Amino acid sequence: MDRPSSRGALALGAGGLGKAPTGGAVQQPDRPMTGQRGAAPAGPMRAPAGASIIGAGPPGTAMRGGPGPAGGPPGTAYKRMGTASQRPGTGQQAAAAAAAARAGQQLQVENRPITNHGVSGMKTAAAGVGRQVLDKNYFMNELRQKRMEIAQVTSNMKSDLEALERKQAQYNSMDKRASDLSKEVKILQEALADYNTVLDKVGSQAPVYVIQQEFAALKDRNEQQRKRVDEVLTERLNLESKAKQAESKMSEIQASMDQRLNSMPPSQRNEYTTLVAEQQQLQADSKRFEEVLDELDKALQASEGELARNPFKQRSLQLQEQIRALTEKKYELTEEERQSKRSPEELRADLMAKIKRDNTEVEQMTQQIRELQDQIKKMEERVKSLGGATSGAAAAEEKANREKFEELLAKERDLNNFMDGFPSRKAAKMQEKQQKEDGIVGVLEKMVKMQGIIGSNLPSQKKYKEMQDELEYKKMQLENTQTTQERLKEELTMRRTELEKIDTLEDKIKLELTQLAERQEAMEKEMGEFGSVEDIQRKANAARERMEGLRSVLLKRKDLLRSIVAERGLKFQAKRAQLQDHNLQVQLEKMEAKLKNLSAGVFEMDEFIKAKESETNYRQLASNIAALVDDLNVHVKKAVV
């Protein structure tokens, strides 16, 4: 692999020397003599007149690439250098300064290099730079280093994970121990409560039967609570089972609905999806409206509570409601008075207009009802069509069979009805036939009698037609007269009813006027009472003074009660201090501590006894020995036999 040239090679190139080819002898290049320095032609090695070599930049390519005098191939110094060779170091500047000194040029102090520690002399060529080409070994070393770092981090993470697992195991064991200890503490607290209860009973010298009664009462109460808990648990299990059954039914219904939905045509499915989305939107709106309504209810309750706490606001609200009611009554009375001053013709016209309006409203409502019924029928037909469309060919066949079966049932029903009613209908028809025959015979007899009476005075055919036409005309006139008479009767009845209404309306108006006059007088009296604001203010002031007096009395009682409570508290503290100083109290505390120690000792002895019993448990061994003896006896008996 080719390596870039070092700084020494660059210095030689700057001084006019080049590196010889690899494997050959270094030949001295042409260099100017001392006397030829001033007259040397301008070339790549010649600096401009008046220019400083030290202040010049790095050497150009003309100083690098020329072949040697022998014409051999260029050395490795003429190869492509790395990025570090683009900026020459201070060593190259020192070589350039040496060349300038040999050329006899004057050094410029202001262009001297500045080192790390200030202005100093020029340094010689420093050591070369590091690696310039990143080859395979470099990357392999980097990969090894990264792999070692990853392995180190992995091992650290594994150790941390193991530490966390150990801590988790310790935490689980400690948690289990804490739960066991909490249970044990709870049991001990219950035992301590029982001991304290017994100690209280012993200290109060309660008889044994009282303790037994309390024990029985507590036992009964615990049994009742246990039964109640069992009932609640049973009810909960029943409810959970019912809920599961309901959920299973809902899932089945949902599955059937999904199946029917999948069997629907795309248009109906899209319509169903649209309706479902609309339903969800309506449910969301309903929920939002319910929330708003709840907020309004809460605000209303808060306002009502505030109003209930403030008696002045309550009184003000009552007065405002009374004023509003009186104002409405005043308007009503004014309107009724105005109506009472009107003539009967105007009242009748208003009544007729009101009747017309009512009739119009009734017709509109009837029309709306018809439209709604039509819409309901359309929606029912649509639902039927949707239900029929989802069932497919099987549903159509089933529907056709059902229709045929219904037709057969209807025909059979009609046939049975006909057979059941045939005798009665036959008798009726025979009776009707007999009556018609008797009528025909009677008519023939009358005709024979009339022919015998009239003889040859029978009218001609033309005269008979005229008489028949005249008879029809008379019948028509009679019908018209009867129709006119009926219409006149109806109109007469309507007029009589209107007259009765008018008569009753006059009486009613008079009665209402009398009542309104009485109500007006009563309202005027009430308005006079409410109109005196001074009386109301005087009553309110009197009530306020009475309340203030009651408040002062209550405050005095409050202070008195506080003083009594403070005095009783001091007495209680004195009694407690006296009790603490009493010898019996000290002895009782000592006995309580001794009882606790004895209880602890008893508990430890019980544990010790249980442990020893478990260690010296011989029953299992005895049972095993007995079983072995039985087996041996059986084998001995078999051997003897």
UniProtKB/Swiss-Prot annotation:
Region (Basic region), start-end ranges: 1-132
GO cellular component: intraciliary transport particle B; motile cilium
Keyword terms, alphabetized: Cell projection, Cilium, Cilium biogenesis/degradation, Coiled coil
InterPro entries, A to Z: IFT74
Region annotated Disordered, chain positions: 1-99
A GO term, aspect molecular function: beta-tubulin binding
UniProt record, GO biological process: cilium assembly; intraciliary transport involved in cilium assembly
Coiled-coil regions listed: 139-633
S-adenosyl-L-methionine in keyword set: no
Broad class of where this protein is predominantly found: other
Claim: Transmembrane helix is one of the keywords in the record: no
Subcellular location: Cell projection, Cilium
Quaternary structure and partners: Component of the IFT complex B, the core composed of IFT25, IFT27, IFT46, IFT52, IFT74, IFT81 and IFT88 as well as associated subunits IFT20, IFT57, IFT80 and IFT172. Interacts with IFT81; the interaction is direct: within the IFT complex B, IFT74 and IFT81 mediate the transport of tubulin within the cilium. Interacts (via basic region) with beta-tubulin (via acidic region); interaction is direct.
Family assignment from sequence similarity: Belongs to the IFT74 family.
Protein function: Component of the intraflagellar transport (IFT) complex B: together with IFT81, forms a tubulin-binding module that specifically mediates transport of tubulin within the cilium. Binds beta-tubulin via its basic region. Required for ciliogenesis.
Protein name as annotated: Intraflagellar transport protein 74
Protein species of origin: Chlamydomonas reinhardtii
Gene name linked to the record: IFT74
